[in-house]
């Protein structure tokens, strides 16, 4: 019994001593751990804390939850100044039919909101994306007379918000806008168009928001490589003004103005040059024998139809306006010249027929030389045909009876060329050509070109 007691006592004492030794050894091992491992452990703990706390610190720095941002800065006081500057990236298109233009640019707003001020020892600004825009006040700028507009969203929405410690804010957007341009086509295609993009606050009138160009005339910047296929950009300028609405009052308005001058070379090749060619081609009929009815009529009809096609093509590419354009003046005057060349031959043909009938009546041969079939044949091809009368006995007296007797030759005007070759070439061919030319054709060869040249001088002098 005594032996069992002592055995239990020594066992308890040994276990107690072992536990005390392990408790003393563990702190010693902790103390023996390397300083490097201690620093790594502390760094990890610090990073975990920063990841959890940093977003909360930014919200606290800007005091987002402590203010009501549904109202403008300085509500109830003077209007908040909002500066604007624009960097034009490109003018994508100009549409004459729709009377609009499409422009891509960077729009930057500058204002001060003391509710967003925060303490900073380095005086560095903080940059945010679009998510903060929904929580604070921003200017409600819109584009007057715009048809379509959107903010670019590749790869993310192109919105940037930068807040400075003193509360100054920069709000930047990349936007594409299609807006109206009230064009005047009275001088088209020798025209110059003045277009403008207008910016204005939608809700805040002059008592609440003052819109101005941040850097004056230098607030509007453009890329040097901007170019258009049909226009040359002469000038970019910035201006400002006030707009009045009867129901809400006066509003500040900013203008992005640009002047477009059309490239004329394209239209010279596509419109003016073909019209000139058709007019000059119509003059060829003045040099064709007046008895060659099919040749002159077909040439006149071809030039008239071609001019009609050119006029239709020009009108199809233009808006339907109620006034006369410069290109309309040129096209219709050119069409008039082509049409008059056809009328000129109709007059020549009629007068020639009347003159020949008078000559035949004076000689008393109308009954013997011209039967019904011969008259119909002459009306068809402009040549006299008679199978019963000897052709060598036929003579035409075109100017006077005395001249006709002097220049009488064998055969009709449409006789075979071999008959003419049998005549003496000592001036007879030239005399025959002169006798076949009507006086109207002779004058038309001079009058038509001279008048058309005078018209071109006046036209280009007025419109260019």
From Swiss-Prot:
Disulphides: 181-195
Its GO CC terms?
chloride channel complex; GABA-A receptor complex; GABA-ergic synapse; postsynaptic membrane
GO biological process: one example: chloride transmembrane transport
Give the main location: membrane
**The keyword 4Fe-4S is annotated on this UniProt entry:** no
Recorded hits in InterPro entries, A to Z, give:
GABAA/Glycine_rcpt, Neur_chan_lig-bd, Neur_chan_lig-bd_sf, Neur_channel, Neuro-gated_channel_TM_sf, Neuro_actylchol_rec, Neurotrans-gated_channel_TM, Neurotransmitter_ion_chnl_CS
The entry's function note states: Rho subunit of the pentameric ligand-gated chloride channels responsible for mediating the effects of gamma-aminobutyric acid (GABA), the major inhibitory neurotransmitter in the brain. Rho-containing GABA-gated chloride channels are a subclass of GABA(A) receptors (GABAARs) entirely composed of rho subunits, where GABA molecules bind at the rho intersubunit interfaces. When activated by GABA, rho-GABAARs selectively allow the flow of chloride anions across the cell membrane down their electrochemical gradient.
Q: What is this protein called?
A: Gamma-aminobutyric acid receptor subunit rho-3
Encoding gene per record: Gabrr3
């Amino acid at each position: 019994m005594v032996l069992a007691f002592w055995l239990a006592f020594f066992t308890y004492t040994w276990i107690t001593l072992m536990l005390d030794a392990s408790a003393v050894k563990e702190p010693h091992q902790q103390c023996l751990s390397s300083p490097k491992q201690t620093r790594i452990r502390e760094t990890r703990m610090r990073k975990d804390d920063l990841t959890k706390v940093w977003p909360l610190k930014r919200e606290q720095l800007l005091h987002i939850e402590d203010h009501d941002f549904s109202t403008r800065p300085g509500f109830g006081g003077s209007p908040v100044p909002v500066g604007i500057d624009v960097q034009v990236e490109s003018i994508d298109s100009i549409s004459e039919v729709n009377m609009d233009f499409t422009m891509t640019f960077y729009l930057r707003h500058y204002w001060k909101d003391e509710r967003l001020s925060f303490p900073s020892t380095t005086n560095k600004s903080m940059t945010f994306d679009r998510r903060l825009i929904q929580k604070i006040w921003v200017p409600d700028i819109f584009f007057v007379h715009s048809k379509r507009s959107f903010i670019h969203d590749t790869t993310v929405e192109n919105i940037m918000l930068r807040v400075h410690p003193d509360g100054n804010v920069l709000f930047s957007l990349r936007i594409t806008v299609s807006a109206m341009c009230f064009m005047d086509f009275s001088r088209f295609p020798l025209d110059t168009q003045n277009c403008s993009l207008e910016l204005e606050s939608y809700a805040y009138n002059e008592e609440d928001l003052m819109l101005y160009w941040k850097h004056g005339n230098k607030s509007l910047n453009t890329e040097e490589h901007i170019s258009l296929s049909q226009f040359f950009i002469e000038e970019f300028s910035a201006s400002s003004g006030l707009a009045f609405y009867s129901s809400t009052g006066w509003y500040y308005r900013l203008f992005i103005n640009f002047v477009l001058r059309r490239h004329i070379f394209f239209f010279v090749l596509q419109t003016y040059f073909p019209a000139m060619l058709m007019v000059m081609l119509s003059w060829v009929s003045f040099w064709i024998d007046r008895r060659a009815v099919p040749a002159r009529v077909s040439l006149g009809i071809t030039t008239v139809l071609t001019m009609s096609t050119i006029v239709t093509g020009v009108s199809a590419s233009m808006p339907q306006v109620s006034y006369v354009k410069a290109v309309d003046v040129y096209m219709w005057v050119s069409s008039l010249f082509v049409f008059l060349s056809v009328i000129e031959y109709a007059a020549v043909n009629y007068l020639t027929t009347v003159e020949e009938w008078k000559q035949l009546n004076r000689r008393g041969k109308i009954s013997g030389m011209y039967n019904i079939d011969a008259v119909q044949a002459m009306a068809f091809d402009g040549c006299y045909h008679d199978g019963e009368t000897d052709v060598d006995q036929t003579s035409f007296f075109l100017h006077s009876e005395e001249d006709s007797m002097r220049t009488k030759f064998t055969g009709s005007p449409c006789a075979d060329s071999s008959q003419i070759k049998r005549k003496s070439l000592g001036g007879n061919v030239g005399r025959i050509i002169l006798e076949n030319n009507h006086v109207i054709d002779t004058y038309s060869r001079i009058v038509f070109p001279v008048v058309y040249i005078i018209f071109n001088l006046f036209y280009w002098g007025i419109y260019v």
